[in-house]
Amino acid sequence: HGLPAQCPNADGTMVHTCCLHGMPTFKLNFDSHFTIKTVVAQNGTELPESILPEATIDRIPPSSHDLESVRGNLVRKNVDRLSLQEVNSLVHALKRMQKDRSSDGFESIACFHALPPLCPNPTAKHRYACCLHGMATFPQWHRLYVVQFEQSLNRHGATVGVPYTDWTYPMKEVPHLLTSEKYTDPFTAVETFNPFNHGHLSLLSPET
């Protein structure tokens, strides 16, 4: 497998390791086409060629194929470490999400978290909040809820995951992304409302 070099035989004038680590000696690469004719064991015994079957190809890959677009997992970053581009993508994604009135929109997902009570269904006589606050299974439920919110943000154009605040570090104020009522796009200089500060929920009030 390695040293000392003993191939093709230990007494040869030009010996090399018996493993394929010595391929450069023969000016071979791993994609070179070659056939092993002689195998010499560590003790110098020459092994017959029949011991190693002829190499075969189990699968011939296609010369070309369609590439399936796959989006990777989103990275969740500390809110204080977001770049201008990342904040910009989050703000515009949340704005689009708030305008979406489908089940993938902000209002539908936000209401599912608490009020108004919509479970077991919106038309039931006795309804309750769909969240599991105060229950032992709340952590598991909330993890899935954050993923649902995050995936919706991504489908609406966010390039990063839901940002977080690191509670292990002292913090003197709430992040500016949440407290500022206005947001100025650093690339267009257009000032609009900040969707992370307030938004529209028709089932509760005009602005929340």
UniProtKB/Swiss-Prot annotation:
It comes from the Eukaryota. Disulfide bonds join 7-18, 119-130. Residues 1-74 are annotated as: Unit E. There is a cross-link at residues 19-21, 131-133 (2'-(S-cysteinyl)-histidine (Cys-His)). Its cofactor is Cu(2+). Keywords: Copper, Disulfide bond, Glycoprotein, Metal-binding, Oxygen transport, Repeat, Thioether bond, Transport. The keyword Glycoprotein applies. Residues 75-208 are annotated as: Unit F. Cu cation binds at residues 1, 113, 133, 142. One of its GO terms (molecular function) is metal ion binding. Glycans are attached at residue 43. Binds 2 copper ions per heterodimer. InterPro entries: Di-copper_centre_dom_sf (IPR008922), Tyrosinase/Hemocyanin (IPR050316), Tyrosinase_Cu-bd (IPR002227). Hemocyanins are copper-containing oxygen carriers occurring freely dissolved in the hemolymph of many mollusks and arthropods. Decamers of large identical subunits (390 kDa), each containing 8 globular oxygen-binding functional units. Belongs to the tyrosinase family. Hemocyanin subfamily. This is Hemocyanin, units E and F.
